[in-house]
Amino acid sequence: MSDRQAALDMALKQIEKQFGKGSIMKLGEQAERRISTISSGSLALDVALGVGGYPRGRIIEIYGPESSGKTTVSLHAIAEVQRQGGQAAFIDAEHAMDPVYAQKLGVNIDELLLSQPDTGEQGLEIAEALVRSGAVDIIVIDSVAALVPKAEIEGDMGDSHVGLQARLMSQALRKLSGAINKSKTIAIFINQIREKVGVMFGNPETTPGGRALKFYSTVRLEVRRAEQLKQGNDIVGNKTKVKVVKNKVAPPFRVAEVDIMYGEGISREGEILDMASELDIVQKSGAWYSYNEERLGQGRENSKQFLKENTDLREEIAFFVRDHHGIGEDSGVEDTEDATLQD
């Protein structure tokens, strides 16, 4: 053994003695090299994310204009975690959570942990306590813009508080990022959009809360309404584009197009039909959609209704779509230990 190797081994032993086993290791010694994920609740978004869902132990930012579907997207993720037997928490800083709508999206409101904090510090401390417990699989903070620092709440209207929220978020994320990774919790931060004053060239839009969240996020999703969906003269929903603007675990800039129906959330039938048509799993001839010579319906809406009534057929088509994109069934919710070394 060379002197360099002996010196390195001694240093590694000293580090493990001081900071505990697993504090330093070779990358190949990690028990899990494959990224563990939980489905977003949308097949189109799972494909756009590239790994079949949201990566566990990572920070996700979902931002977009008002009423674009940000909370709907995050509630579908909560419903998916609960469906797999996991624990979910919702920090409602906006004080705008609608339990009836959440229930329609499949959220079990009897099991969902809800906090409506008075200040930004309180909301982030509650989030930290839940993450450090290691018992929460997903936590949603709605929204970053509503995490108002205590000094601003206790001050007078018109008082200037420059950079307070950015400093609060920066400090919170420094503390949270390590705990989120160890506990394998998915932390979703919903954010709003603001416009910079005086921008002549480039995009004037920005997100509040400083730059820290942009850096700490593994995935950033931009949610925007594309067009209205109508049945006759009635507007029944929106076609929504979810763009993956940052992705550390797969190629970014993929776009998922989903139908968000009022009172129902993301239409599973709509996204399966669109994706299967693109892959020629479902054949389209004129206005008719068919699968294995079985006609699904005339027109997109009728075909969606047929799939809604025939769930076995819908899931069979979804299986072939997942298989084509190399996305298996969700990795699910597991009991994970902090130690990542093999015994």
UniProtKB/Swiss-Prot annotation:
CDD domains per the UniProt record, alphabetical: RecA (cd00983)
Keywords: ATP-binding, Cytoplasm, DNA damage, DNA recombination, DNA repair, DNA-binding, Nucleotide-binding, SOS response
Gene3D superfamilies associated with the record: P-loop containing nucleotide triphosphate hydrolases
Name of one Pfam family that matches: RecA_C
GO terms under biological process: DNA recombination; DNA repair; SOS response
Signal peptide region: none
Alphabetized GO MF terms: ATP binding; ATP hydrolysis activity; ATP-dependent DNA damage sensor activity; damaged DNA binding; single-stranded DNA binding
Family, as annotated: Belongs to the RecA family.
Function: Can catalyze the hydrolysis of ATP in the presence of single-stranded DNA, the ATP-dependent uptake of single-stranded DNA by duplex DNA, and the ATP-dependent hybridization of homologous single-stranded DNAs. It interacts with LexA causing its activation and leading to its autocatalytic cleavage.
Name of the protein this chain belongs to: Protein RecA
Native organism: Bacillus cereus (strain G9842)
Upper taxonomic lineage: Bacteria, Bacillati, Bacillota, Bacilli, Bacillales
Name of the gene this protein is made from: recA
